[in-house]
Amino acid sequence: MTWDVIKYPHVTEKAMNDMDFQNKLQFIVDDSAGKNEVAEAVESQYEVSVVGVNTQNTMDGEKKAVVRLSEDDDAQEVASRIGVF
């Protein structure tokens, strides 16, 4: 299920810079989720178009996904809708 893939938005200073300048959002996701699953979950939950997904495992043992949105979607607007700020 797509609602189980995304745990919560990852909010750091770097995440804010990515959002402002590169139209990217960062999320902590389920450890077993693949890039395609993350893209599908973001597209269905937030009604945006995803161009690319990069994932990495953090030092805390969590999986972080950096999601790049299409130029038609604004990462700041999506972040405000989901309550990042």
Language model regions located:
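Contiguous, often N-terminal, cationic amphipathic patches that form binding interfaces
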Residues: 1-85
